[in-house]
């Protein structure tokens, strides 16, 4: 035995075997280092490639971009072998914009939890949740709630009583939390519907507790922790994140990222937690996602499973971060592919995954396809052009209603008044909301498109695109689109003298009736 505690082989045969094994280890290490060098790392920016050079059919991607237009996507990005093979932005969304990713936030928070475990800031996902909040007098703390562990939050099997269905029904409990003054307390105080670990139930409150635990364990705001441990290594510099009234970043939603940066998160998982030779998150954590065991009970075939903020389809070896209105990061390891989608409405996931897998079925480069590439380029250009909504003739009421301030009854939107100027050469609107003062009103104002094409302008950190058209002589349809959030709000305003009735609806399923009275 040598001074390092290693026993030398005792025969020439074993010496030869050991030498061969040593060569294998050395060559394997060299190969691994070579692999790292060969893999494109988009820290400072993504490389682009023709689809066929990466074994992807450009004609199939053209069909996919067209599908995106019909499905109200805001962006579509496909990466194969570490290179972008198509990238489409659907007007009025544009390259370089952040997009609210909704529940894709959960996958990012799950990744941060994995990093915290790897760094020892969270000792184990088996830690009891209540131990992270020793100063709180938690309601219903007796019984099964004491058994609640961080792992249950990560898999949404907390057992807390929570109504946030993955359907068109309103997420009642999530909305209650968002209206409360203490989100963490609201979640912790929920009664138990099941014992922890016994049933999956979609619950953004679970994830808000994970964010709160991260902030407590790391002594950092969750966004700052993300910047230091995840975003900076991946080259993600443009992110915003909603916080609760106490300043804790929302764990279940509220993160905004650019699509290219969303793709980096997916690429990190495709590379099993490594990035340019650096271990960002442990391979064991990636395996926790890739071998998810919690059935989501969606009643679909194939079945979906869940782990650490990610949806998985074991039968297809597909891994997805999924946000409301189809904000998506899709990882297909068998195809060496990552796809990102942002958008404004839900649609079936499985056909999209099948389209992506079929487009990247080839294992080697394909012959150049000039016709297919031209068609793809045409579809991408077409996506960037807004399609005009049909408009009819202007109503004689346009002059009558313009310049008046329409004051609304108290309402959930907080909308106090609306002023329209529809007769100017550049029509405009002005909306005042609760929360401001006479000297400094909380106000949004900007141009309105009356030709079927929306007019975009900055509204704080957001971009608002607005257009209007007459539906007959007394009803004005007013459409405002929060471009960065995928939220479209349509108001049918019916004027009756100095009064107006408004039927408001959003693409998120929210409807409301409002009433206003005009003042000069």
Summary of predicted features, one role per range:
Residues 163-243:
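A small/polar active-site loop signature that marks catalytic segments
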Residues 323-389:
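Structured C-terminal helix/loop/strand segments within mature extracytoplasmic catalytic/sensor domains
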Residues 2-3, 12-15, 19-94, 99, ...:
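N-terminal leader/targeting segments and the immediately adjacent pre-domain N-terminus
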Residues 82, 99-125, 153, 210-214, ...:
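Active-site SXXK
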Residues 370-520:
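Peripheral terminal and inter-domain segments
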Residues 206-213, 253-274, 327-344:
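Active-site-proximal alpha-helical segments within enzyme catalytic domains
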Residues 238, 286-339:
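Active-site Gly/Thr loop motif
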């Amino acid at each position: 035995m040598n001074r390092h505690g290693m026993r030398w082989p005792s025969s020439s045969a074993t010496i030869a075997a050991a030498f061969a094994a040593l060569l294998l280890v050395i060559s394997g290490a060299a190969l691994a280092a070579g692999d790292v060098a060969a893999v494109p790392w988009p820290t400072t920016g993504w490389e682009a490639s023709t689809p066929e050079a990466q074994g992807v059919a450009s004609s199939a991607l053209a069909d996919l971009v067209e599908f995106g237009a019909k499905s109200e996507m805001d962006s579509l990005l496909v990466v194969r072998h570490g290179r972008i093979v198509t990238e489409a932005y659907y007007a009025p969304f544009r390259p370089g914009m952040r997009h609210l990713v909704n529940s894709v936030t959960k996958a990012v928070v799950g990744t941060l939890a994995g990093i915290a475990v790897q760094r020892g800031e969270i000792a184990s996902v088996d830690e009891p949740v209540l131990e992270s909040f020793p100063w709180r007098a938690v309601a219903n703390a007796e019984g099964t709630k004491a058994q609640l562990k961080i792992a249950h939050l990560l898999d949404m099997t907390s057992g807390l009583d929570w109504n946030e269905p993955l359907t068109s029904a309103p997420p009642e409990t999530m909305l209650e939390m968002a209206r409360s003054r203490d989100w963490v307390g609201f979640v912790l105080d929920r009664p138990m519907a099941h014992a922890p670990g016994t049933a999956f139930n979609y619950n953004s409150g679970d994830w808000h507790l994970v964010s709160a635990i991260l902030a407590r364990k790391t002594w950092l705001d969750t966004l700052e922790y993300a910047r230091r441990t995840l975003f900076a290594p991946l080259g993600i510099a443009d992110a915003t994140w909603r916080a609760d009234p106490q300043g804790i970043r929302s764990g279940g939603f509220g993160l905004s990222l650019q699509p290219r940066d969303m793709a980096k998160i997916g690429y990190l998982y495709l590379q099993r937690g490594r990035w340019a030779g650096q271990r960002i998150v442990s391979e064991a954590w990636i395996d926790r996602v890739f071998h998810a065991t919690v059935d989501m009970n969606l009643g679909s075939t194939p079945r979906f499973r869940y782990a650490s903020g990610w949806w998985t389809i074991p039968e297809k070896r597909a891994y997805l971060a999924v946000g409301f209105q189809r904000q998506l990061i899709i990882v297909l390891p068998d195809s060496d592919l990552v796809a990102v989608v942002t958008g404004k409405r839900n649609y079936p996931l499985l056909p999209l995954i099948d389209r992506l897998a079929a487009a990247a079925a080839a294992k080697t480069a394909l012959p150049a396809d000039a016709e297919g590439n031209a068609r793809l380029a045409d579809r991408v250009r077409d996506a960037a052009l807004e399609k005009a909504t049909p408009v009819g003739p202007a109503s004689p009421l346009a002059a009558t209603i313009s310049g008046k301030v329409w004051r609304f009854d108290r309402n959930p939107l907080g909308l106090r008044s609306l002023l329209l100027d529809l007769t100017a050469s550049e029509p405009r609107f002005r909306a005042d909301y609760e929360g401001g003062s006479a000297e400094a009103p909380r106000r949004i104002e900007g141009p309105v498109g009356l030709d079927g094409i929306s007019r975009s302008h900055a509204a704080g950190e957001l971009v608002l695109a607005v257009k209007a058209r007459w539906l007959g002589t007394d009803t004005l349809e007013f459409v405002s689109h929060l471009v960065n959030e995928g939220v479209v709000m349509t108001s049918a305003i019916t004027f009756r003298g100095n009064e107006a009735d408004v039927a408001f609806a959003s693409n998120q399923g929210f409807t409301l009736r409002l009433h206003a009275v005009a003042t000069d």
